[in-house]
């Protein structure tokens, strides 16, 4: 999607393709869409995210899974309350590890968005994290399918997947992304320089 003047995507298509080349094909199966999206201003305020997995995304009249990567408004700050639950505290530490310069006052953690560090977050964490969600969906719903099973069986597994608590799904996706990135780092494959810098 076309971005607003104050927003841009920190990852290029070339960056995404370079990383995907190292994802096992069976882990993304029929996940063929990666959408570079411009979030609405209200979404940025109320429900900001680096990206997300959409299990059924409408595209050219078809519905199929897609990963959404959100553009970032660089006139805004990353701003979190200091009253963080353990999972949010863990995410704050991940952001620090990505390079984001986190400052704090009595009430908030803040950071200026920097495309170099946004790229680190979206390319090396968000993308494999969302693929991790899809791997869990494949393992729970798709791969157990039998050729002669009824549609009721498929929907039963689908319902079971969406009944998994959010914290369990997040833990699965974090483990997948962490294993993938640790392996890539050990092999010297990441980090790599921007292949087509979007901010220059």
What does each of the following model-derived ranges do?
Residues 1, 10, 154-200:
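Long, well-structured alpha-helical subdomains associated
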Residues 1-116:
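A metal-dependent hydrolase signature that marks the N-terminal structural subdomain at the beginning
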Residues 15-22, 130, 172-180:
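Amphipathic alpha-helical segments that form well-ordered structural scaffolds
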Residues 30, 142, 187-191:
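Short, flexible/disordered secondary-structure transition segments
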Residues 86, 143-145, 185:
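Glycine-rich, phosphate-binding/catalytic loops in enzymes
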Residues 125-138:
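Active-site recognition of the HExxH zinc-binding catalytic motif
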